[in-house]
Amino acid sequence: MRPRLTAVFALTLALASSGGAAAAAAPTAPSVKPPPTLTDSHPCAGQPGFTCSFLTVPLDHRGHGKGELKLQVATADNASAPKGTLVFLTGGPGQPGVPFATRIATQRLPELAKNYRFVVIDQRGTGEFGALNCPKLQAEVGSSDIEPPSKDAIAECANILGDKRNYFTSEQTTGDLDMFRQALGVHKWTLDGVSYGTFTAARYAAAHPGNTDKLVLDSVLPHTDPQNDDMLYLTGLRATARVLRDACKTAPACGFDPAQDLAWIARHRTDSVLVWDMLVSYEFLDPTYRNPNPAGLPAGSGDPVGAIHAARGGDPTRLDQMLKLLDSGGDPVTGYSSGLHIATICGDGQFPWGTSESPVAKRWPAVDRVLRKLPAKATWPFTTKTAVGNGFMTECLSWPRSQHSAEPPERLPAVPTLLVNGDRDLSTPLEWAKEELGYTPRGQLVVVKGASHSIQNRELGHQGRDAVIKFLNG
């Protein structure tokens, strides 16, 4: 179901007869809401060239829930940029947008900032002024999609959010974004999303095709899931074999099969979910997966390919050390809200049991039925236990019933769309980008060799960013 549009006209026409002539009463004046505006504008602290403001939005764009939210936004000062407005959407879900304004516009994509007015938003439930704070969940999993939280952490978060958990889906964020567009006074804008921001950008385009000029989808999560398996992360599990084998073939070649090593680990240890979480976290430090000395870790503590191989050979020391060093949890809530993450994922996702509106008691039996039919190759080199034990599944199995995000059309509108993905990405694997390309009538895919997640923000080279610049400036 689409978000409901608020009615703006209520016209009563009274007819009276007198002397054979019909006389109409004067119509009631239509009640029209004023357009959204940005308030409390001021220079963004530490971000020259950007003005920070607040956008007031309804708690519930469907009109059932009462209340309002104030979302922080940042807008570049070049309001008359020749190519219009570009809204940059961060991921998670759980990341704010405002802290990234200067880095993206002036350090990573200055060629675009000359021609576009960059704008960002702290999406509902995120950032300095609106982050949903669930302390136990924040401490246990932080920004991880994969590490499973405890039942106590999930229950605490559900109690903290209460009925408001219904109002933090991407459907609601899409409504916020269109109010932001209106407040800026632009008819069309370009949307550039990274990671979960690709999901949000695509969902916006599906709901507002006439207001979408171009789309950039960087590190892609498909906007639709007809197979109902994205939350099992089956594509990511299988992609691990391809990524590690590719890393091992890079000179100097390993001389062994890292996928077979990982398959052995997944079947002989009880922490395969945490091993998988470590690999996904590690890609942000070292997309080669083989550097023993990556920045951000103590010397000699990198190289998960070698650590997994050594563990299979009987020495788990390095692997155990990596699991400790890259253990998730503890991210500051203003930088990443685990509470927003759980509310959005559970409200947006399609699961083996259906959606967040399915009764909690019926969810595990549905998962069990799916797992009984799932072939080993669907999760290899991991196991079905790894799939069902991931954070998405663990969080949402016991999450209270809540409003499910309106489902979009399977095919996106025919707007120019660039998809860009690293072939070493495990968080949003290349296979997902190829799937989304099939839903995109005017899409083109650029694969960045040797790169992992978040091309525009983290790519070491320039191939991906050059493709984005050419696409948008062309």
Locate each region found by the language model:
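Intrinsic-disorder/low-complexity peptide segments enriched for small residues
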Residues: 3, 9-13, 57, 67-69, ...
